[in-house]
Amino acid sequence: MEGTRSRVRITVEAEVRPTEDREKVLKAVRNVVEPESVRFEKIGSTEILVGESSTLASLSRLHSILRAERILDAARGAMKKGVQGADRMTIHLHKQAAYKGRLSFVSSDHESPMGAIRITIEHPNVREVIDWLAPPTVRGRPVFERRMPE
């Protein structure tokens, strides 16, 4: 199991704007993802929340919300657009929606007034991760449900 965990890396990043409260940005992130570690980095005048995890279990909330909100098709499309090679994908979520426990996919930081939450998933087979998080659907219902990839 430990060898598998080291092949998985999840990085969550969200800018903390000067008018924002760090705790609210952290809440927005934790409403969607459960990182194992969180830190705040200062890059020039910009502060960024960085969360990291080495297990897909940290995406369990995202998995559940996608089903509760019935947005598997939109999520699958956003995830497929974010694929970078066989082992990496990045998605962007609207920060204010995440704060309220909702999901809204955006294509860039500019679509979220306070900046987006960027989630980068590295896994040996990122397509398996997509199939687990957002399987294909027929009439809004998943064609299959996969177990969490290792």
Curated annotation (Swiss-Prot):
InterPro entries according to UniProt: PAB1135-like (IPR002739), Ribosomal_uL5_dom_sf (IPR022803)
Coiled-coil regions listed: none
Membership in a protein family: Belongs to the UPF0201 family.
Descriptive protein name: UPF0201 protein APE_1751
Protein's organism: Aeropyrum pernix (strain ATCC 700893 / DSM 11879 / JCM 9820 / NBRC 100138 / K1)
